Amino acid sequence: MLCVNVELQERRYPILIGSGLLQDERSYPIKRGDRVMIVTNPTVAQFYLDIVIYALEKRGCVVDHVLLPDGEKYKTLESLNLIFTALLQGNHGRDTTIIALGGGVIGDVAGFAAASYQRGVRLIQIPTTLLSQVDSSVGGKTAVNHELGKNMIGAFYQPSMVIIDTLTLNTLPKREVNAGLAEVIKYGAILDYEFFEWLEQHIDELVALNPEVLQHCISRCCQIKADVVARDETEKGDRALLNLGHTFGHAIETHLGYGNWLHGEAVSTGMMMAAALSEELGDISIADVSRLEKLLARANLPTVSPDTMQPEDYLPHMMRDKKVLSGKLRLVLLKSLGQAYVANDTAHTLVLNAIRRCTQTD
C-alpha cells in the first residue's frame, strides 16, 4: 500500500492507494457506533456496496446507503436532494460520515452533500474510476451541474480520507479507463515533463491495466495534485493549471448534453485545442503538439471536435466558465510540455482558429 498526504494550512489527510483496500476494515477511520451514509449508484453497488458495508459493520458502524441514478446527466440538485432526504429520514446528525463510493459524479454530489448537510459532516472519498482516482476525489472540489453550465453550483470541501482500491478498475468499462487516462496525461503536460516521458513509455501498459504500472501512475498523479492543492486550496493561483483543456471540454459536454461524451474524452479534445492555441501564440512547438496528440491517440482518446459542433458553438459556453473574470476569457495554455500558464483575455479569433484546427474533416 502507498500513502500520499495532502498537506493543507490547517490540517492534512491521507490518500491510501493499494489493492484490496475496500474489504479491509482497517482502511476505514471510523469507530464502533459511528453512523455512516454510503452514497453510490446501482452500477457500482452491484460490485462493491456489500463489500464496504461488511467491512464497516465489522468495525461496529451503523450503515445506511442511498442509490443515485448513474451518469453525468444526474449530477443535479435533484440527486443532491435524494441524499438529504435519506440523511433526514435516517435521523443522521452532524456526527455522521458520508462515504462517496463511485466515480466523479458520485464524488462531486456526495461531497457537496457533506459540505452542506447541517453545515458540514465528515466525508470519505472512495473513487472507483481511474478519472476520479487521479483527479476529482482529491482536492475538495464538489459540485452539481446546471443546464447552463457544468459544476456551477458547489463548494470547496476536503475529505478526511481518500481510499483508492486499484482492484475497482478491473470492473470498469474500457471507455471509462481511457477517459481517466486523459487526466493522467494532463498532469504530465502541465507540470511534470519527466512524467510525460514516462507515460510515452508506459501508456500501453496503463491501457492494459498492468497493476504495478497503474499503482505508480495513480500515486504520481495524486502527489502532483496534492502538491498543487497544498499551495492553492481554493484555486486562486496555481491550481487553475489543473484545468488544461477543461474550458473547451466543458463546452463540449454542455453543448452535447451531459453524458454523451465522457468528461475525460471532452478534456482530451480540449487539451488538443489548448495546445493548438498555444502553438498559434508561439509558445509550444508543433513537434510537442504532435507528441501530445499521439499520446492521447494511443490512449484511445478523441483529439478532434465532435462532428455535431461548429467552432462558433464553443464561445458562448466558454464565456460562462468559472475562470472568466470581468467578462474576459482565461485559458490554461502550454509554454512547453510540462509547463503550463494561464492566459488572460486571449483574442477570440485566435481561439476560434485553434478550434478549427481540431475540427473533423472528411
Curated annotation (Swiss-Prot):
Gene Ontology cellular-component terms listed: cytoplasm
Residues that hold Zn(2+) according to the record: E183, H246, H263
Required co-factors: Co(2+); Zn(2+); NAD(+)
Q: What does this protein do?
A: Catalyzes the conversion of 3-deoxy-D-arabino-heptulosonate 7-phosphate (DAHP) to dehydroquinate (DHQ).
One Gene Ontology BP term is: aromatic amino acid family biosynthetic process
Catalytic activity of the protein? 7-phospho-2-dehydro-3-deoxy-D-arabino-heptonate = 3-dehydroquinate + phosphate
Q: Which residues bind NAD(+)?
A: 70-75, 104-108, 128-129, 141, 150, 168-171
Pathways per UniProt: Metabolic intermediate biosynthesis; chorismate biosynthesis; chorismate from D-erythrose 4-phosphate and phosphoenolpyruvate: step 2/7
Any idea which GO molecular function terms this record carries?
A: 3-dehydroquinate synthase activity; metal ion binding; nucleotide binding
Annotated protein name in UniProt: 3-dehydroquinate synthase
Per the entry, the cofactor note is: Binds 1 divalent metal cation per subunit. Can use either Co(2+) or Zn(2+).
One Pfam match, given by its short name, reads DHQ_synthase
What are the protein's UniProt keywords?
Amino-acid biosynthesis, Aromatic amino acid biosynthesis, Cobalt, Cytoplasm, Lyase, Metal-binding, NAD, Nucleotide-binding, Zinc
Q: Which species does this protein come from? A: Haemophilus influenzae (strain PittGG)
